[in-house]
Amino acid sequence: MSKTNSETGNNFEQQKQELIAALKACGAVRYGDFTLASGKKSKYYIDIKKASTDPKTLKIIARQAALRIKEMDVDTVAGVELGGVPLATAVSLETELPLLIVRKSVKDYGTKSRFVGDLKPEDRLVMLEDVTTSGGSVRDAIEVVREAGASLKYVITVVDREEGAGEKLKEADVELVPLVSASDLLK
């Protein structure tokens, strides 16, 4: 028996509330004066790297992302160093899909590759991101993956700060799938 859209919507709402409670309980939401990766100033900071070190919160994130992935035509889970790696690793374990780590730059030793893991031109990836603001950080990783010939149409973010990332990714033909929005988290 399949679930109705109403049941699925209620389930996603329950999951969102569970994740919000976990993020707050592990201390991932902080207030003060912060500078974001984009250079913008903010009165709050969402520390998903801290949440990633809490096994209960990381498990909730992985489980919820895995449920979204079931609706996508993908065969590889990717994450950008540093914040996306624990998320993508946990989701890879949950979904049993292969993991790809995207480095921010080429190392001048070892394989000298931007990728850790196998990437083939026919691969269809979903990228995991900790927090999205403007979408600039993840855009570089999307371009590198696409230059290698693989397809990337989805970015799952734990928290979307609702400051333009969705629109910027849409321009690149990528759908942003937030588990939680900042406005929901900060209520």
Swiss-Prot record:
<dbReference type="GO" id="GO:0019856">
    <property type="term" value="P:pyrimidine nucleobase biosynthetic process"/>
</dbReference>
<comment type="similarity">
    <text>Belongs to the purine/pyrimidine phosphoribosyltransferase family. PyrE subfamily.</text>
</comment>
<dbReference type="InterPro" id="IPR023031">
    <property type="entry name" value="OPRT"/>
</dbReference>
<feature type="binding site" description="in other chain">
    <location>
        <begin position="129"/>
        <end position="137"/>
    </location>
    <ligand>
        <name>5-phospho-alpha-D-ribose 1-diphosphate</name>
    </ligand>
</feature>
<dbReference type="GO" id="GO:0000287">
    <property type="term" value="F:magnesium ion binding"/>
</dbReference>
<dbReference type="InterPro" id="IPR029057">
    <property type="entry name" value="PRTase-like"/>
</dbReference>
<comment type="function">
    <text>Catalyzes the transfer of a ribosyl phosphate group from 5-phosphoribose 1-diphosphate to orotate, leading to the formation of orotidine monophosphate (OMP).</text>
</comment>
<dbReference type="GO" id="GO:0004588">
    <property type="term" value="F:orotate phosphoribosyltransferase activity"/>
</dbReference>
<feature type="binding site">
    <location>
        <position position="161"/>
    </location>
    <ligand>
        <name>orotate</name>
    </ligand>
</feature>
<feature type="binding site" description="in other chain">
    <location>
        <position position="104"/>
    </location>
    <ligand>
        <name>5-phospho-alpha-D-ribose 1-diphosphate</name>
    </ligand>
</feature>
<feature type="binding site">
    <location>
        <position position="103"/>
    </location>
    <ligand>
        <name>5-phospho-alpha-D-ribose 1-diphosphate</name>
    </ligand>
</feature>
<feature type="binding site">
    <location>
        <position position="107"/>
    </location>
    <ligand>
        <name>5-phospho-alpha-D-ribose 1-diphosphate</name>
    </ligand>
</feature>
<dbReference type="InterPro" id="IPR000836">
    <property type="entry name" value="PRibTrfase_dom"/>
</dbReference>
<keyword id="KW-0808">Transferase</keyword>
<feature type="binding site">
    <location>
        <position position="133"/>
    </location>
    <ligand>
        <name>orotate</name>
    </ligand>
</feature>
<dbReference type="InterPro" id="IPR004467">
    <property type="entry name" value="Or_phspho_trans_dom"/>
</dbReference>
<keyword id="KW-0460">Magnesium</keyword>
<dbReference type="Pfam" id="PF00156">
    <property type="entry name" value="Pribosyltran"/>
</dbReference>
<comment type="pathway">
    <text>Pyrimidine metabolism; UMP biosynthesis via de novo pathway; UMP from orotate: step 1/2.</text>
</comment>
<protein>
    <recommendedName>
        <fullName>Orotate phosphoribosyltransferase</fullName>
        <ecNumber>2.4.2.10</ecNumber>
    </recommendedName>
</protein>
<dbReference type="GO" id="GO:0044205">
    <property type="term" value="P:'de novo' UMP biosynthetic process"/>
</dbReference>
<keyword id="KW-0665">Pyrimidine biosynthesis</keyword>
<comment type="subunit">
    <text>Homodimer.</text>
</comment>
<keyword id="KW-0328">Glycosyltransferase</keyword>
